Amino acid sequence: MYKGVINFTRRVRDLDHTPEYWQSESYSERIKIIEAVVMDKTTYPPTKKLQSVREGVFKVPPTITVEQLVDLSKALRRWYKIDCFQIAINRTDNTAHMLFDWIDRETGQSIYYNTSESIILTVFVLRFLNLPKPENTRTWFRYDLLWEY
């Protein structure tokens, strides 16, 4: 999301199945739900440019489990309204892949965050999983302090 710590990109299919994998719904099932929500709230079909499903990719240590990432997904849903429905951990390069639904259920529109909100989201993930702060994030001190109080 910010300077290579967490990268969010548009995704148009399911995550690859790995030995450490969790799924609440398939991609096609979630797209049907998203289309229904958008039609219900906005009364028009979703556009092709709508980035309703995005994949979040970030480095994790070998000790991180799928259960910890499921707990993270619940916290992200509660705090940021983004709903994770698939998780995979690739142990060859120790990366976590999480597939998120970025549609606001109240408005039917895609959720977007500005730079400050993106940094806060990234710090939230790093602190939730007790991951080390990358070197290029020294200027994030004030966002780190936000979670202390």
Where are these regions (language model features)?
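N-terminal nicking endonuclease/strand-transfer module with a His-rich metal-binding environment
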Residues: 1-149
